[in-house]
């Protein structure tokens, strides 16, 4: 399943998101959700320990001035890659 986090993790039920992640799922951070990718924030460690790949939409990182601040564990992607993720996963959950 593809999970998309478009809101700040501080304004989301992040614990519920983590509970619903399964091995093989993927998480895309976009819009204000990209703040979860900033190195050193409290949500990043939970994402590192999850059995998933975590991506961040590069355009949203650039728009928020965060490109130099994200963790190396987060994979920046563009809109073409976003489309590939949606095609790959038949189910999607938006947060």
From Swiss-Prot:
GO terms for cellular component: sulfurtransferase complex. Disulfide bonds: none annotated. Coiled coil: none annotated. InterPro entries: DsrEFH-like (IPR027396), Sulphur_relay_TusB (IPR023526), Sulphur_relay_TusB/DsrH (IPR007215). One of its GO terms (biological process) is tRNA wobble position uridine thiolation. PANTHER family: PROTEIN TUSB. Heterohexamer, formed by a dimer of trimers. The hexameric TusBCD complex contains 2 copies each of TusB, TusC and TusD. The TusBCD complex interacts with TusE. Part of a sulfur-relay system required for 2-thiolation of 5-methylaminomethyl-2-thiouridine (mnm(5)s(2)U) at tRNA wobble positions. This is Protein TusB.
């Amino acid at each position: 399943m593809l999970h998309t986090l478009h809101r700040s993790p501080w304004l989301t039920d992040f614990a519920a998101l983590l509970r619903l992640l399964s091995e093989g799922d993927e998480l895309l951070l976009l819009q204000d959700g990209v703040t979860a990718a900033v190195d050193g924030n409290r949500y990043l460690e939970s994402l590192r320990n999850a059995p998933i790949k975590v991506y961040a939409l590069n355009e949203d990182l650039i728009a928020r001035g965060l490109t130099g601040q994200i963790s190396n564990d987060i994979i920046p992607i563009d809109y073409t890659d976003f489309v590939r993720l949606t095609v790959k996963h038949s189910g999607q959950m938006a947060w």
